[in-house]
Amino acid sequence: MSSEHIQNKLALLPDQPGCYLMKDRQGTIIYVGKAKVLKNRVRSYFSGTHDSKTQRLVQEIVDFEYIVTSSNVEALLLEINLIKKHDPRFNIRLKDDKTYPFIKITNERHPRLIITRQVKKDKGKYFGPYPNVYAANEVKRILDRLYPLRKCSTLPNKVCLYYHLGQCLAPCVFDVEASKYKEMQDEIVAFLNGGYKTVKNDLMKKMQVAAENMEFEKAGEFRDQINAIETTMEKQKMTMNDFVDRDVFGYAIDKGWMCVQVFFIRQGKLIERDVSQFPFYNDADEDFLTFIGQFYQKANHIPPKEIYLPDDVDSEAVQAVVPDTKIIVPQRGNKKELVKLAYKNAKIALNEKFMLLERNEERTVGAVERLGEAMGIPTPSRVEAFDNSNIHGTDPVSAMVTFLDGKPSKNDYRKYKIKTVEGPDDYATMREVIRRRYWRVLKERLPMPDLILIDGGKGQIDSAKDVLINELGLDIPVAGLAKDDKHRTSQLLFGDPLEIVPLERNSQEFYLLQRMQDEVHRFAITFHRQLRSKTGFQSILDGIPGVGPGRKKKLLKHFGSMKKLKEASVEEIKEAGVPMNVAEEVHKHITTFNEKAKNTEQK
């Protein structure tokens, strides 16, 4: 659609609440929003300046629709449903549910007490969430001892162990009145809603009576139940003392991002929290409302008895989303402090996010920029690094890794089997791989690097530059990475003539070069080992006097693997059925081969 088309539609927007749907060139809905005044909100996207994320959204908008509603509350409810239906990519996307465990009383003729992570609309009674399965199991264990509900998923034809333990009424054999189940369910509900203190007091009275009647075994059982209640139900620090289930919301905003923290308070205890961070495009309080609406659409987020909100939120709109929950905007006291605590945690989480982003920027993009400055070249956003690997001239390979803005781009990694070089000639190997790589770059019009890094010194650098300039006509900066006697990145060589680029050893740009050199070395060695594992046995035994195809097969059959042959003594090799002089030659050859391999891998 043309900008004229959008301007014409903007002129027709009403001064009423409603929802708007932004569309891209394919007609896909990419963003859904709500507004108290549609005209003001939608026009704001196409006028004035915006931050980068909002600008990205606006750049993709080629058309929009709107739906007028009778109130802001109705707009919120409609927005939630539209987001659920269309899943626009620029809207808040709540992370996948963290499925908390719940205790459930099943809706069956003979109900069971189970632990589940799935909350369904099946008329069962759900209690929770609990912070983990262990906590839920602890509570269920107490309930199983106190209330003998059915344990088996299907009724057997005879009583089981639970009946003999007093933890099941055995409905498989005996008739159990529905009123008995209702009584137990009511007591379980009361227990989980803070009434366990009443249960504990009743048990203490029963324990005293049993002790007075000399029924010490029964008194001991009551004592164990009391101890279980004390250790399980009373070990957490109380947040509130009225045992009401609550969700406490707080949010913070910074640099176009919002963090929402939700504290789950169950039975007076703060048991868990949910943290969500996302960019927002609307007014902060409006997007926060949308978040709450989406939050309680998740199956495992059961609205509690009460919800605490910050004082800048439209509580009437939230009430429409969760009509059976009491919405409270605390003004003072402990309740207000809980909301402040949720806000404080949200602010800390956002600060940490941006600090981590800054640190990551410092060690990647920032390091690349400073590396370019130190070398006197434009910022090398794309760096391609090369390393060769061979052992005694066998299976020579080369590898290339690519870093984009200081980060590995593994889709752009390449590995090469060397085709034209005989023996361990590092310079010729470098010439071949540079020729193959950049001939293809030219042919297929692939992205050119801003810098080529060679794992080596003057000889390797000159070989690479000669191919680039004199054969391919390319002028790409080439630098070399030298190592010290401990095989660690030591110097960056660059220029004509070559000079050491002065870099602080503890600088991020030096660390970046280390990561590049280590990564290309790892990639080359891994590729070389893969080839050696396929051809190693054959190639190591090639050229040994007295070892032809028949004896190679005999050695392989006897030892089973190259690893075992490498570890074998002369006598053990002789036991494979070869003469002593041949066994000595094989052992000598393998020992020499292993020493050279070790030295090459340390390169």
Swiss-Prot record:
Gene3D superfamilies associated with the record: 5' to 3' exonuclease, C-terminal subdomain, GIY-YIG endonuclease, UVR domain, UvrC, RNAse H endonuclease domain
| Segments forming domain UVR | 197-232
Q: Which superkingdom, per the lineage?
A: Bacteria
Q: Which UniProt keywords apply?
A: Cytoplasm, DNA damage, DNA excision, DNA repair, Excision nuclease, SOS response
CC annotations in GO: cytoplasm; excinuclease repair complex
User: What gene makes this protein?
Assistant: uvrC
Query: Does the record bear Lipid metabolism in its keywords?
Result: no
**What is the protein's species of origin?**
Listeria welshimeri serovar 6b (strain ATCC 35897 / DSM 20650 / CCUG 15529 / CIP 8149 / NCTC 11857 / SLCC 5334 / V8)
Q: Where does it mainly reside?
A: cytoplasm
List the molecular function annotations (GO) for this entry: DNA binding; excinuclease ABC activity
- Report the protein name in the record: UvrABC system protein C
Pfam family for this entry, one: UVR
Q: Which family does it belong to?
A: Belongs to the UvrC family.
